[in-house]
Regions:
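Bimodal "functional hotspot" detector
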Residues: 3-177
């Protein structure tokens, strides 16, 4: 099993978005990798962003996402976490087997959180390349840590998603395998 597009992490461009302020809550995933970035200052908090553990994916042993810690502005932590996600893993994290599968997306053009559902609009491209793992996995893993988010709907750059009006998560057809 190979994750198509695993080398996307150098092509990602961070984008500024806006979101409803909330606080982060711990997840039940594997323990986060701590980067050397330090403790948060006043007005900041530590959140997790989730990258693909390429070794686990290649041998078919979940969980495929591994959290790493990032310090973000506490005024809009959901949006800031997505910005950090699209920056990709650090060189040290890449050396440890973490990857960001951008699926041709370059960032997020808009983030809205309404009634505990995050609506994420991708910027750039949108193509899973046939992989069963896509940028949607990273985004969903990163956003559900926040108490403001129970579901994630991801839209392609044209504003389309598979189930816009149904409860629960949704991804655009371009991110289907």
């Amino acid at each position: 099993m190979v994750a198509s597009g695993c080398s996307d992490d150098d092509d990602a461009t961070p984008t500024t978005t806006s979101a409803t302020p909330t606080t982060a809550t711990p997840t039940t995933a594997a323990p986060p990798t701590t980067t050397a970035s330090s403790s948060p200052a006043a007005g900041e908090l530590t959140v997790q962003v989730f990258f693909l553990d390429e070794d686990a994916f290649n041998i078919g042993r979940p969980p495929y996402l591994r959290p790493v810690e990032r310090v973000v502005d506490e005024a809009a932590p959901e949006a800031a976490a997505l910005d950090r996600l699209f920056e990709g893993p650090t060189a040290e994290e890449r050396a440890g087997g973490l990857r960001f599968v951008a699926s041709q997306a370059t960032g997020v053009s808009e983030l809205r959180i309404e009634e505990r559902t995050a609506h994420v609009y991708l910027a750039g491209g949108c193509n899973s390349g046939g992989s069963t793992f896509s940028v949607a996995d990273h985004i969903t893993g990163t956003l559900v840590q926040f108490t403001s988010v129970d579901a994630v709907k991801i839209y392609d750059p044209d504003g389309q998603t598979a189930s816009p009006d149904e409860p629960g998560d949704s991804v655009p057809f371009c991110l289907e395998p």
